[in-house]
Amino acid sequence: MALTLLRGMRTPVVARRNAGLFFTTLQTPLLSRFTTRAESARAAAHKSIQLATKEAAEQKTQSFEAVIGIETHVQLSTVTKAFCSCPYSYGSQPNSTVCPTCMGHPGTLPVLNAKVVECAVKLGLALNCEIATTSKFDRKQYFYPDLPKGYQISQFDIPIAKEGYLDLDLPVEFGGGHRRFGVTRVHMEEDAGKLLHSESGSYSQVDLNRAGVPLLEIVSEPDMRTGIEAAEYGAELQRLVRYLGVSNGNMQEGSLRCDVNVSVRPIGQSNFGTKVEIKNMNSFSAISRAIDYEISRQILLHKEGQADQIVQETRLWDESSQKTFTMRKKEGLADYRYFPEPDLPEVVLTSEYIDEIQNSMPELPEAKRRRFENMGLSMQDVLFLANDDNVARFFDSTLEHGADAKLAANWIMGDIAAYLKNEKLSIDEIKLTPLELSELIASIKNGTISGKIGKEILIELIAKGGTVKSVIEEKDLVQIADPAAIEAMVDQVLADNPKQLEQYRSGKTKLQGFFAGQVMKASKGKANPVLLNKILGEKLKANS
């Protein structure tokens, strides 16, 4: 990377041009004017990055386009590790679930966990991949303190699955639309350990609990063009592994980790630009923001004639500064010196084995979205219901008990979702059952209770459980649908509010809502609102 030094004549001030931006190092106390100039330079640099970020987000007005691919590591929810019988549980005491095999002791031999192969085939099929009937393991060799063997067991030239794709629907707030992103390969490998750094930074410790834990790496084609598309791709993969039950997909626990490759090129150019890998993104929102920043950084360098400063490297996303920083220069495949793993045989799969797994596959998110869409639900409803497998199951079960699809979706997306958000609960943690939600919807639809009373009953059922019928009976909540009874209440309210009635006659017709509210109050919310408005309208018209 080019380095330009600018030295002041009297004061040893060193200014460095890095990535097209000025950074100033003060070697001795300066006069305030030099400090002001340095701050102004930094402010101008920060402003230029912000402007470039905004421009990059509006790709249509740019002369550059981004090319984005993602490598996703999914930690499998197997009982034991990939090549030994050690269990793994997130948060365990450091180095408490290890053995000579996963610690890399001499003379130990790996034994493949058959469940890892099953999970790999499941995910490969879900990603519409070609499953290899014969694949093999390889040694990926590199040195790092958390890699006890000095190599990682992975798959190199013959992965277990390849040439697939992932379909998804973008959220409505991001423009909507269907997308299909290619999947280059899915391969099996083992995880490394973890370094624990001291607060002072003076030393690090190694926890090998995670060493040997099975992973699936999913490599996408460079088909994405925006941070939003990449984030939604990652979110769809998370949904997929959760639907399949192969992983919990929790990014906070490291069960799903995304490394993003980003490059930019002039629109219309077929050759790829120099790609940069970004790590350390712990949420899908962070993925989107990191990519948008990196796109803006690279476009800025191109516009300033410094494209040669974009080098193949690994950069870390820093959440506090909302920027990426150089971590290391990117290694090439030759640096890993791959060669076949001599201690493991080839993985040979029969067509019967693959078919058996195919036939046991659950309904996947894409198929579920299309089914919900065919029910006449809006795309917003479809995405909300299908994005969480537990919510989708609750919705389907409610329909099985006879509820109308649109009404059930409205209740789940409205009052139930609001309660879950406020209480920080998932839908499988509440006491309301799909049967009782369908009963509640039916009770409102047939006029037994009003919608207002229905909301009150819903909250009680969510928090305490029980049945709709018992709550209605215990609290005497049956809707008043007798016209004579409602008429009597309307007459009483009009008689009790002569001043408002006179104002209504003078043209303040909005007071009809006031009278309706008073009747509902007198009936404790049980008056049939349709019948009430009809009778009230007739009475007010007669009194005008």
Swiss-Prot record:
Coiled-coil zones: none
Catalytic reactions of this protein: L-glutamyl-tRNA(Gln) + L-glutamine + ATP + H2O = L-glutaminyl-tRNA(Gln) + L-glutamate + ADP + phosphate + H(+)
Any one Pfam family match given in the protein's UniProt record, by short name: GatB_Yqey
PROSITE patterns documented for this protein: GATB (PS01234)
A single GO cellular-component term on record: glutamyl-tRNA(Gln) amidotransferase complex
EC number: 6.3.5.-
SMART domains: GatB_Yqey
Leading EC class: ligase
GO MF entry, a single one: ATP binding
Subcellular location: Mitochondrion; Plastid, Chloroplast
GO biological process, one term: mitochondrial translation
Subunit structure of this chain's protein: Subunit of the heterotrimeric GatCAB amidotransferase (AdT) complex, composed of A, B and C subunits.
Family label: Belongs to the GatB/GatE family. GatB subfamily.
Role description: Allows the formation of correctly charged Gln-tRNA(Gln) through the transamidation of misacylated Glu-tRNA(Gln) in chloroplasts and mitochondria. The reaction takes place in the presence of glutamine and ATP through an activated gamma-phospho-Glu-tRNA(Gln).
Official protein name in the record: Glutamyl-tRNA(Gln) amidotransferase subunit B, chloroplastic/mitochondrial
Organism: Oryza sativa subsp. indica (Rice)
Gene for this chain: GATB
